[in-house]
Design a protein with these regions (language model features):
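N-terminal loops that bind phosphate or other acidic moieties
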Residues: 121, 160-162, 166, 176-181, ...
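Conserved phosphate/anionic-ligand binding catalytic regions in large, soluble enzymes, centered on
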Residues: 189-203, 281-292
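Long, charge-rich alpha-helical interaction segments
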Residues: 221-225
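A long, hydrophobic alpha-helical segment
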Residues: 169-189
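Phosphate/adenylate-binding glycine loop and adjacent helical scaffold
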Residues: 1-146, 152-169, 188-193, 236, ...
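Acidic, carboxylate-rich catalytic segments that either coordinate divalent cations
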Residues: 249-254, 259, 263-302
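A structural-propensity feature for long, helix-poor, extended segments
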Residues: 234, 238-254
């Protein structure tokens, strides 16, 4: 496979600079404040991402690392040449890649979800998702050697815990501008509030029956007005979510919930994939997804 390019990535040439090299991605910063993420794995696809395939990624990663290497601090010309080589390799990978746009499939799933015609279908989906979340988190605790089955919220400094972020998140629920107030809120390169909103919009689009990008129009407008409050990674994630293009792991969650042939094991697999995304990004997005299914006032504890 020649690779994949997100549907919101404009064709090169880009007036971009290398912004960072991470364990699973190389980031390009565009003049408009958005990031193009060159991802190591196909599962990391997003609206503004490029997956070049394993061999091309290795070349891009090596060139980008050379461009940022401390060993080249005394040779800025060599570092600049390495960065230019990385960008050239990324542009070549874009040219070879196939478009990735999940919106047609998400629209089918949204219509199918609505056509199921059951009152309370979102709540039933939430029950299935909570059960899958319990199974996935129990399996994760077992892998990490936790035998007591506790969730460890006492030491959890995420938006679910009882630390500063968790307490602030609970307080924000009482605000008139919630959940738009979550833009840029919380820990992470992509702030936790942005992940939560991406999950929320994804589920709202699913349950609307109209497909991606239509639900919660007022909230979407509020988010647009607040994009300058978050990081480049957060803006990029939310730009995709606003356009109805959630990250691939959320697309898999929709597929597992709305595809009639998908069973509980497939849903657990999708949840496990989500939980593996970032330090807490996937879990934060699942929280937002559940909140859209249940209503903002409902608890999202698994």
């Amino acid at each position: 496979m020649p690779g994949l390019k997100g549907c919101l990535v404009a064709p090169p040439p880009w007036e971009a600079k290398l912004a960072g090299v991470f364990s699973k991605a190389v980031a390009l910063l565009l003049p408009n404040g958005l990031l193009i993420s060159v991802v190591r794995d196909e599962g990391g696809m997003e609206a503004l991402a490029l997956w070049p395939g394993a061999e091309a990624y290795a070349r891009i990663d090596a060139a980008a690392m050379a461009g940022f290497s401390d060993a080249r601090a005394d040779s800025p010309g060599a570092a600049e040449a390495a960065r230019s080589a990385a960008i050239a390799a990324i542009e070549a990978a874009y040219a070879a890649a196939e478009p990735w746009d999940p919106r047609p499939r998400l629209a089918e799933l949204s219509r199918a979800f609505a056509a199921a015609g059951r009152d309370g279908a979102p709540a039933a989906a939430a029950d299935r998702l909570r059960a899958a979340l319990r199974r996935a988190e129990a399996a994760d605790r077992h892998r990490r050697g936790g035998a007591d089955g506790t969730d460890g919220t006492a030491d959890d400094d995420t938006i679910r815990g009882n630390g500063p972020y968790g307490r602030a998140f609970e307080a924000m629920k009482a605000r008139d501008d919630f959940p738009a107030a979550l833009v840029g809120f919380g820990p992470g390169t992509t702030p936790a509030g942005d992940d939560w909103l991406a999950g929320y919009l994804c589920a709202a689009d699913l349950t609307s029956g109209r497909g991606p990008g239509y639900a919660e129009a007022a909230l979407r407008n509020e988010i647009v007005c607040r994009l300058d409050r978050t990081t480049a990674a957060g803006r990029s994630l939310l730009t995709g979510a606003l356009a109805g293009v959630p990250p691939r792991y959320l697309c898999a969650l929709v597929e597992a919930l709305a595809e009639p042939c998908a069973g509980d094991d497939e849903l657990v697999d999708a949840v496990e994939s989500a939980l593996s995304h970032g330090a807490s990004s996937g879990r934060d997005a699942v929280d937002g997804f559940l909140s859209a299914l249940l209503g903002l006032g409902a608890t999202v504890e698994a």
